[in-house]
Swiss-Prot record:
HAMAP family: AroQ. Homododecamer. Adopts a ring-like structure, composed of an arrangement of two hexameric rings stacked on top of one another. This is Catabolic 3-dehydroquinase 2. Signal peptide: none annotated. GO terms for molecular function: 3-dehydroquinate dehydratase activity. Substrate binds at N74, H80, D87, I101, T102, R111. Keywords: Lyase, Quinate metabolism. The gene is qutE2. InterPro entries: DHquinase_II (IPR001874), DHquinase_II_CS (IPR018509), DHquinase_II_sf (IPR036441).
Amino acid sequence: MPSLLLINGPNLNLLGTREPHLYGATTLRDVEEMSRVQANNYGIDLETFQSNHEGHIIDRIHSARGHIDVIIINPGALTHTSVGLRDALVGVSIPFIEVHITNVHAREPFRHHSYLSDKASAILVGLGTYGYEAAIQHAAKNMIRKN
């Protein structure tokens, strides 16, 4: 069965309560459940992972090698700071989709640069939590080979 890995980075465990005027009321658990149902509808296995620690995220990316077809990642603040995360994603040679709930380009200037975007297969910003749905749909229809 094809497989996706959904990774959420720092502070995304606070979805639903952290700055709801920016991120909405949907919790991370809601996002993961919705994503699992949607992936299942496409016949895709979905694994989820969230950490506030860069090294743990890098370790999880490394462990995906050989059994994950596509990574969907909302790297949170690591987007703008982590060369290590970029190197991990490039190093495992697994295509990935970068997702951001808010439009990072309409926010503070330090959020405008991503260390990942030039290596991502697709980038979804500013769609709210619908961005996760769109990423799964794109992966299912355009990135995963059906056997």
